[in-house]
């Protein structure tokens, strides 16, 4: 609870988004079972939804509190997760990035640096019973029962029960 109280105080001073980012970074580097338990508990208090039976590994950072983590979710080490709705029994490998859409940065105005241009953030849905392989980048919706091959870049929506791989990710076959 002291961490949550610290988060609430920081929220009043530096804003909720920045305070959440700092909290997520702090908890990402706590090793072992203590870290896993601590991450789960702090995210149950700060994310839109986080169930008690999820597993969030070392080095994983959430950039926004606008996330839902459903029952039975496993998130591997060193992941970066933006706005996301992660369905039941999803497996996310290590070093996976789930971006808040594929248009987080605008580039239209050449007289304004890209970092100052407003982007569009989108909550990314990941359907239940999906497995995302290591080192994948997710920028769009993934249906239920999908398998995303390691190193894939998902920039278009993926239909239910698809097996995809590559950059950009393409359907290899359907599970059903």
Language-model segments: what does each one mean?
Residues 66-67, 145, 155, 161:
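A short, glycine- and basic residue-enriched loop/turn
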Residues 134-147, 152-156:
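Beta-rich strand-turn-strand
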Residues 164:
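Conserved active-site beta-strand element of glycosyltransferases/polysaccharide synthases
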Residues 51, 127, 143, 157-159:
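Short conserved AdoMet
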Residues 35-41, 60-70, 74-142, 167-168, ...:
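Flexible, glycine/small-residue-enriched loop-and-beta-strand segment within the central core
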Residues 1-53:
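A transmembrane-helix-recognition feature enriched in membrane-embedded lipid enzymes
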């Amino acid at each position: 609870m002291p961490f949550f109280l610290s988060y609430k105080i920081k929220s009043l001073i530096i804003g909720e988004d920045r305070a959440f980012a700092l909290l997520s970074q702090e908890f990402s580097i706590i090793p072992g079972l203590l870290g896993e338990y601590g991450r789960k508990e702090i995210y149950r208090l700060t994310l839109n939804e986080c169930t008690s039976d999820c597993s969030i590994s070392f080095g994983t950072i959430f950039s926004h509190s606008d996330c839902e983590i459903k029952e039975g979710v496993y998130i591997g080490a060193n992941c970066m997760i933006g706005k996301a709705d992660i369905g039941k029994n999803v497996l996310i490998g290590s070093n996976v990035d789930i971006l808040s859409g594929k248009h987080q940065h605008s580039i239209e105005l050449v007289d304004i640096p890209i970092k100052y241009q407003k982007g569009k953030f989108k909550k990314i849905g990941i359907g239940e019973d999906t497995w995302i392989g290591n080192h994948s980048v997710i920028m769009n919706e993934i249906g239920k029962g999908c398998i995303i091959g390691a190193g894939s870049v998902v920039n278009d929506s993926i239909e239910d029960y698809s097996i995809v791989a590559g950059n950009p990710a393409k359907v290899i076959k359907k599970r059903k």
